[in-house]
């Protein structure tokens, strides 16, 4: 389909009271230790940044707790995952995300390339686009603390990719 489901953003996060100078260049982060979940990829640019000090942790819950406790100044992970896990841990108000994201990409539903499914994919894309313009969609985003303007900005930024 032409219409993407959402945008996946891999972002840096820190405590709300921690000052970090980051303007979108990974070189800005040379003096910091960045928590990463072992075995995960955070985009080629970050993964290949050997000049950064990265500390592996077992899982996302541990990553968040180490950042919130001050044991790590920064963490990196999928933004939606961090929001969800931090919310379940009751610490969502203790962290903030740094902009811009380190990596982002559109997520699509996959359909077989068989000719008879092409029409279904086109209908799905049209219906998804209509749904994204609905109040129901905005209500869902609000429920899960995702701003519509944030998604619109991401859609505009990634429309060329």
Residue ranges of model-derived segments:
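Extracytoplasmic/secreted envelope proteins and their assembly/folding machinery
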Residues: 10, 26, 43, 61-64, ...
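Extended ligand-binding regions for polar small-molecule ligands
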Residues: 17-20, 32-33, 110-147
């Amino acid at each position: 389909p032409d219409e993407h489901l959402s945008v996946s953003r891999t972002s840096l996060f820190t405590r709300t009271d921690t000052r970090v100078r980051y303007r979108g260049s990974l070189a800005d982060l040379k003096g910091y230790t960045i928590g990463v979940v072992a075995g995960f990829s955070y985009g080629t640019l970050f993964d290949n940044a050997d000049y950064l000090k990265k500390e592996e942790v077992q899982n996302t819950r541990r990553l968040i707790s180490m950042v919130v406790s001050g044991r790590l100044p920064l963490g990196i992970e999928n933004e939606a995952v961090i929001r969800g896990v931090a919310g379940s841990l009751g610490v969502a108000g203790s962290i903030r995300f740094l902009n811009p994201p380190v990596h982002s990409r559109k997520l699509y539903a996959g359909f077989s390339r068989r000719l008879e499914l092409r029409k279904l994919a086109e209908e799905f894309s049209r219906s998804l686009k209509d749904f994204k313009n609905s109040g129901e969609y905005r209500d869902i985003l609000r429920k899960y603390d995702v701003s519509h303007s944030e998604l619109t900005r991401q859609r505009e930024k990634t429309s060329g990719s």
